[in-house]
Regions:
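Periodic aromatic/glycine/histidine/acidic cluster detector
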Residues: 23-119, 124-144, 148-167, 172-214, ...
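Bacterial N-terminal signal peptides
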Residues: 8-20
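Bacterial N-terminal signal peptides that target proteins for export
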Residues: 1-9
């Protein structure tokens, strides 16, 4: 019995040594631009990983603090030297140096899938982008650092289709566009005081409508009228409100 126990223990210890050798930990270093570097003074990130059966189990850290830059993830071994790796499946979660979440995105069959979200270091959301099988699909948004929405755009089949709205940092409207396959067909814009700057329709790349300029006191400065992409009339006013020839 004692002899059997000793043999069993030896087998377990040997298996442990073999496993450690098989799954030996490695490191690869990146500079602040995400490029691999062997110059330690320029290292900004370090990736620690093991490889088993062609799959790398990895986690990224800020260097030299070793604060986590990512949660653990798995990628094909050939992706291990790519700073932003493409996962076969699962979530990639990144963190700011101060511990605030930076990004969460999910892969399915090596393609972005579902809602990807980014945050500023202050914890406020910076962007949201929906994906379906690697293509932009749905409504994406961007935000200012103060949390106010900067823009919102509709995607279909990986192109802008639908509305595209933009706002100033105080939340007042800046621009509204109607998009068809990444091209605007209607544009309406305002200045920071809420005055209309342009009201344009576009067909086959040709503009129709008006473009306005304003003085700081709210008086109209100029008005340009376009038809079939040709400027057909432009009127200027001075600060007193008189037409300038």
């Amino acid at each position: 019995m004692i002899q059997y126990w000793r043999k069993s223990l030896a087998a377990v210890l040997l298996l442990g040594v073999f496993s450690q050798t098989w799954a030996q930990s490695h490191s690869v270093y990146f500079n602040q631009h995400g490029k691999i570097t062997a110059t330690m003074s320029s290292v900004a990130y370090v990736r620690q990983y093991t490889v088993q059966s062609g799959i790398a189990k990895a986690q990224d850290f800020y260097y030299p603090s070793m604060k986590k830059y990512s949660d653990p993830y798995e990628v094909p071994a050939e992706q291990i030297k790519v700073f932003v790796p493409v996962l076969d499946n699962g979530a990639l979660t990144l963190w700011h140096f101060n511990g605030q979440k930076k990004m969460v995105g999910t892969y399915k069959n090596s393609k972005p899938n579902g809602e990807w979200t980014n945050w500023y270091p202050n914890g406020k959301k910076s962007a949201v982008m929906p994906y379906q099988n690697g293509l932009s699909e749905g409504t994406g948004s961007r935000y200012y650092r103060n949390g106010v929405k900067e823009s919102e755009i509709q995607f279909k089949h990986d192109k802008a289709n639908g509305y595209w709205k933009q706002w100033y940092p105080d939340g007042s409207p800046k621009m509204e566009m109607n998009m068809v396959n990444d091209k605007p067909t209607e544009i309406l814009s305002w200045d920071e005081n809420g005055r209309i700057l342009s009201e344009i329709s576009i067909s086959n790349g040709r503009r129709n409508g008006i473009v306005l300029e304003w003085y700081e006191d709210g008086a109209k400065k100029s008005e340009s009228v376009y038809s079939n992409d040709q400027l057909v009339k432009k009127t200027h006013w001075d600060k007193e409100g008189y037409v300038v020839e």
